[in-house]
Structure formats: structure tokens, C-alpha cells
Amino acid sequence: MSGGSSRRYPPELRERAVRMVAEIRGQHDSEWAAISEVARLLGVGCAETVRKWVRQAQVDAGARPGTTTEESAELKRLRRDNAELRRANAILKTASAFFAAELDRPAR
């Protein structure tokens, strides 16, 4: 769904979908067929969404290489902290330049 509206599903639904795919995988010819069935049963608009949840669960469990959910959250937090520190640093540089200019002025 590139460029389309994004719908957030509750974590409980995501976890349930992943469990259901694992449970019914053997009843289908392919993983995609199981994923499509689960998406239909749970009312998830796009089977690709469920596929992504399954892949992320595999990464989180260490069964597939990639960035875990925990690592992604930490990266997001660190990037936010870094941006905040850069803003604070820019403010401090501006303030120090201002005060340095004040000190260089001759006293009246």
C-alpha cells in the first residue's frame, strides 16, 4: 500500500494472526495461502500486511535475519535523542557566539 492510507492494527490482532498462520500452515499448499486465509478470517484488508507480521515475528524469534522490533524501537529512540541533542547544541553555539560578541565590546 505505497502512498495509501495506513491502518494500525492492535498488537493482539497481529500476534493472533501470526499464531493462526503457524497453526493452519500445514492445511494449505503454501505459506501464502495460509496467510491469505488468515487475513480474510481476521478482516485484515491486505494479505501482504499479515505476511509482514509473520516475517517480523520470525526475525524477532531469531529464525530469520533482520532488525528486530526491539532494535527498531531503540534505533528510533536514539535518532530522536540525537536530533534533540543537535538542536540543543545549535542553540548553545548561537548563545555562546552572542555572549562572546558581548564580551568583546568595549565597556562604556
UniProtKB/Swiss-Prot annotation:
Tell me a GO cellular component. Answer: plasma membrane
Give the record's keywords alphabetically: Transposable element
Q: Which InterPro entries match?
A: Homeodomain-like_sf, Transposase_8, WH-like_DNA-bd_sf
* Top-rank lineage group of the source organism: Bacteria
Where along the sequence do coiled-coil regions lie?
none
Provide the GO biological process annotations: DNA transposition
- Gene Ontology terms for molecular function: DNA binding; transposase activity
The family assignment reads: Belongs to the transposase 8 family.
Name-wise, this protein is Insertion element IS6110 uncharacterized 12.0 kDa protein
Organism encoding this protein: Mycobacterium tuberculosis (strain ATCC 25618 / H37Rv)
